[in-house]
């Protein structure tokens, strides 16, 4: 992975630090990208690297993820992450020049980006990959139940590994990760683990904090859905295959489908940017060219 052309450490309200990295073409349209719960922005390199020749790509991790130091669990919640987002945008503009920002978010960061936009209109458009806003998969279980299940899984997850290779091998045995190329599973392990005290490796995002985010998710996603008509910028949602068992389904209301400019990738799961980076990059460019770069 290439070194960023610039890095700015953003000091947010409670003393936490967010490392924002700049890649790509500084003269191009500006993309601001973040990641899903428990993951890291560097993990999405197979996707955003395809946009780097044309776009000014600014990436950042959520607090307690990726490049950022761990924070106390009590400060780890969606309202605080929304405030972090706002501070990140302010720093990007002040350090690297003021120009329109196009948000590119996945999973939990889509909810944060949408909540950010409702509070303050910092984005000129939002490209959203597989946010869960109403029902999961075919609707056989509610979003609330799914969030609770994900929280339980996070708390039960193995937390210590001898090496990143051990985690990468375990990922290869899990069906949800089987659609990723082996090198992407390896990248996932490298970007989500850090050396542990006493040897071995542990997750950069503590499992308890990941679980807590899932528990916050439901309430905020419902709030976003109820305010869908408040958005006055172009929106694009690309979901996983609705039959995959974990996919964005905005509702059965055709007006909601139209508002989100909804599309999906057949045969892909929640991790579609990691499974089909080329298709996701093409859809990103197509959306921006159609709505804001024409």
Model-derived regions, located:
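Conserved HGGG/HGGXW glycine-rich cap/lid loop of the alpha/beta-hydrolase fold
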Residues: 21-70
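Flexible "cap/lid" loop of the alpha/beta hydrolase fold
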Residues: 126-164
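Conserved alpha/beta-hydrolase catalytic His-Asp/Glu region
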Residues: 158-213
